[in-house]
Amino acid sequence: MRSLLAASTFLRSGASPLLRPLSRPLPSRLNLSRFGPVRPVSAAAAAADKSRGGGGSAMEAQPSYPGEIHVIVGPMFAGKTTALLRRVQVEAGTGSRNVALIKSDKDNRYGLDSVVTHDGTKMPCWALPELSSFQDKLGTEAYDKVDVIGIDEAQFFDDLHDFCCKAADRDGKIVVVAGLDGDYKRNKFGSVLDIIPLADSVTKLTARCELCGRRAFFTLRKTRETKTELIGGADVYMPVCRQHYLDGQIVIEATRIVLDLEKSKVIHAFK
């Protein structure tokens, strides 16, 4: 039975933390809260790690086999994070591969030290502002030993395309990416769609419409905030079907007009 590589441990050098194999299988309901946090290495430790063998030509760094890229997309509450953890288990195989998880440090809903599903299950991760800093944070020696990289909330990483190309094509990593393909306006969100041409597989998940129970492909924002990046959960967003997405836009626009009129009346009353 396949096992999940999830626990944090230090390499023998003591320089860098790395997620190592576990012997227990992933249950049907994920329960990963027992794992301790992954702690980032210091800049000094990373520099020392580089000096031990981080250099080398591009030819020397070329892996003996190419990597892979697997993409998981869908609206909010579609189970993308759960699918990410399950896919990581599959790619981990029988326990012979090392895995590291990354998420954007913009996603602070459940803390920055774990990837957390909406039902509260978690797994330790690296929270980073950009993916390009991952190798430096982990250390070259530890990075070379990572076989599988999972990326959650991938829409927040501007350098997603470049990182995936480098990790899979040059470094031979298996990269599993989970993120929103569209924003609350149904427009492209971040660079997730840009890596689909690079992908070995693409999985489109759906949620259940919160209003009728039908399949939900879209995310409806319930507030008046208009900026694209607005971190939130069920208090801000809900998954909806096509009909209720369209109905919701009408309601939101009507509400905006009414509120603007009321605001205008209040302003004029004080003049």
Curated annotation (Swiss-Prot):
One of the record's GO molecular function terms: thymidine kinase activity
Binding site for substrate: 184, 237
Keyword Transmembrane helix assigned: no
Catalytic reaction annotation: thymidine + ATP = dTMP + ADP + H(+)
Active-site residues, as the UniProt record annotates them: 153 (proton acceptor)
Binding residue positions for ATP: 74-81, 152-155
Annotated InterPro entries: P-loop_NTPase, Thymidine_kinase, Thymidine_kinase_CS
Pfam families: TK (PF00265)
UniProt cross-references to Gene3D superfamilies, sorted A to Z: 3.30.60.20, P-loop containing nucleotide triphosphate hydrolases (3.40.50.300)
GO biological process: DNA biosynthetic process; thymidine metabolic process
This protein's UniProt keywords: ATP-binding, DNA synthesis, Kinase, Metal-binding, Nucleotide-binding, Transferase, Zinc
SUPFAM superfamilies, A to Z: Glucocorticoid receptor-like (DNA-binding domain), P-loop containing nucleoside triphosphate hydrolases
Enzyme nomenclature, EC number: 2.7.1.21
Keyword Nucleotidyltransferase found: no
Broad class of enzyme this protein falls into: transferase
Binding site for Zn(2+): 209, 212, 241
Family, similarity comment: Belongs to the thymidine kinase family.
Name of the protein this chain belongs to: Thymidine kinase
